[in-house]
Amino acid sequence: MDINQASLQMHYDLHGKIEVISRKKIETREDLSLAYTPGVAEPCRVIAKDYEQSFKLTRRSNLVAVITDGTAVLGLGDIGPAAGMPVMEGKCALFKEFADVDAFPLCIDSKDTDTIVQTIYLISKSFGGINLEDIAAPRCFEIERRLKEMCDIPVFHDDQHGTAIVVAAALLNAVKVTKKEMGKLKIVINGAGAAGIAIGKHLINMGFGNVIMCDINGIICEGDEGLNPGQEEISHISNLNHEHGKLADALKGADAFIGVSRPNLVTKEMVSIMNNGIVFAMANPTPEIMPDEALAGGAAVVGTGRSDFPNQINNVLVFPGVFKGALSVRAKEITELMKQRASYAIASMIPDEELTPENIIASPLNKKVADVVAKAVADTAIEEGIARV
């Protein structure tokens, strides 16, 4: 039985991967009167007088909403909200397993930006954080921006920022392995959607040299016509030498390639014209170039999104710890500095003496990562003055 059929059978057997468990046993009349009527009226009265008490008297202090509209689910595309539910449930299971953060999946049956924003805002008082998931670009940028302005809890689009954080962590260690200079790198990112643009911004904010964005038409340059707002924004801070051409042109002399695009777009010949290249080919399930081909082309370090190859670059290293840290100090938001510190925290999980071309990033199953990331995020929130406890 292949992995797809095995997963399908597991889902049929389980009828869902998550469930709600009561934290209070209700076995006596007294239990009932404390957990529900009449006793429950008192915490209601306290919250009505002081909104902040909702974080102390209910579970929202440790509860994240995992929300999609089903328009960009994995590599499946626009499959609708109901079909996105297995992914949202899986995400919730990972929150609990790796960070002991409770999470609840919500799938919104709308593609209208205003409707999605209003729906999420109206339910936000039930949660301590909002994890946006699998929402197509460019709509995802506006949805996140507006919700961050409206909500008083962290809003985090994991496809953007989770991916960016873990890629930066892997790149920090790959730079050490290859003895390159972080600030002098030429980095080519193929795929100018939600993940690619977020990776580009994050790497630039961290001081990773010159980032060149590419899409289906080739290199993106400031002043190009037909760019969406996200691409237009990053065009002003990337491709500092105003290069033009196709992906192969961008890769000449490049130190790193980061792919968040489509399978089999890169050849070993293209890798061979890089500068002792770092290759992160993260298209799933088939990467832009297979690791053996990249290595044959002269790549120094290769990472993918897959668990069956070394250096799996996976968001599960990010979102459990980021939210655990933010929730622990009641942070109002997840800032750029918090994201940068998260990248350094993940990178630190591999000591320098253990770094090799096949070992630049912690295993996604390493449950110590979430606590290290959480501490970095929480400490940064306190430092920036956005913690509320």
Residue ranges, per PLM feature:
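Glycine-rich phosphate/diphosphate-binding loop of Rossmann-like nucleotide-binding domains
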Residues: 74, 81-99, 157, 161, ...
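Adenosine-phosphate binding glycine-rich loop
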Residues: 158-159, 281-389
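N-terminal ligand-binding/catalytic initiation module
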Residues: 1-155, 380, 384, 388
